[in-house]
UniProtKB/Swiss-Prot annotation:
Its EC number is 6.1.1.21. The lineage of its organism: Bacteria, Pseudomonadati, Pseudomonadota, Gammaproteobacteria, Enterobacterales. Coiled coil: none annotated. The keyword RNA-binding does not apply. Its main location: cytoplasm. One of its GO terms (molecular function) is histidine-tRNA ligase activity. It comes from Salmonella arizonae (strain ATCC BAA-731 / CDC346-86 / RSK2980). SUPFAM superfamilies: Class II aaRS ABD-related, Class II aaRS and biotin synthetases. Keywords: Aminoacyl-tRNA synthetase, ATP-binding, Cytoplasm, Ligase, Nucleotide-binding, Protein biosynthesis. This is Histidine--tRNA ligase.
Amino acid sequence: MAKNIQAIRGMNDYLPGETAIWQRIESTLKNVLGSYGYSEIRLPIVEQTPLFKRAIGEVTDVVEKEMYTFEDRNGDSLTLRPEGTAGCVRAGIEHGLLYNQEQRLWYIGPMFRHERPQKGRYRQFHQLGAEVFGLQGPDIDAELIMLTARWWRALGIAEHVSLELNSIGSLEARANYRDALVAFLEQHQETLDEDCKRRMYTNPLRVLDSKNPDVQALLNDAPALGDYLDDDSREHFAGLCKLLDAAGIAYTVNQRLVRGLDYYNRTVFEWVTNSLGSQGTVCAGGRYDGLVEQLGGRATPAVGFAMGLERLVLLVQAVNPEFIASPVVDIYLVAAGTETQSAAMTLAERLRDEMPDVKLITNHGGGNFKKQFARADKWGARIALVLGESEVANGTVVVKDLRSGEQTAVAQDSVAAHLRTLLG
């Protein structure tokens, strides 16, 4: 017998019960984005490899270790996208969306990184990202953070996430800080692990991200990034904090917070949780005012964020399971006998016209009442509609509440109104 072919490690199937959860969460996210005036952009999964090398930085873990890169039949180097910002900027430049314009965009879809799979971290994962172009003040940074805070309230997880902020300043300020940090680390190399020693010269700010407790203790005495900020970045960050204070959004300034991608400047932020173990970052972003020009466009201020949907789904399931406890099916239509099947399907179509948001399944494949009600239970239906020959003749249908067991005969012409009352 042929060996079964299974999914690639770290790339998961999401089955119908799971996709229903994803759809509800995604619908909530998209509704909030729409309320802020953001528009969807759809981007390719595969891009030219130089796009990510130029945008992310060649000495980052993503480019050095994690990208899925291959040659196509023309010999061109292509990469499965590891993140969405670079592709969004590329599309904006290519289609003339950015120069001298204000854009609020969002995208959603799979990303790919060759990492060690674990809970909340996969090789194919899904991100929702939002990017704003053409606005340089701290007010738009604040709007993005307010938008994410509204998500948490809508999903019922606001008490389980917290906001961390930092400013990493201008390119020049970071260069000065980098020199000071490297000088400090060189004096304490005996405390550094091999990964930090490698990063010390290639990307020293990433040492601040180290999870090694000895390195973290050492960093308590390291130069502080905030002491090296340029005046404009300091003023920008103060303006952001003032706006968040006015909006009642709590935050912690974390001077060790940097981003893993090279294109960020000034504001960086993360929403973190203690409810998912080691995978604590739910949403992260910041400003990247130089990236558009770096990729061949004209200088354009920009800010954005990305959120891992796998982690968000896990978090909602962990702390607010009621949000996702909606039934897969609202109504199951039981048809008693083959002679009633046509009438049942006609009634079902009429109900779908009158109640387009209701999930309704019509029984197919026959079966007695016991089997059909068992199918209704399996689907998690709240209500069963029972249509037999007498109901067809009388123009009625029996409506049974599968939770209380109560049932009543209702005229087919008025059953939609009756169902709306039962379903709330």
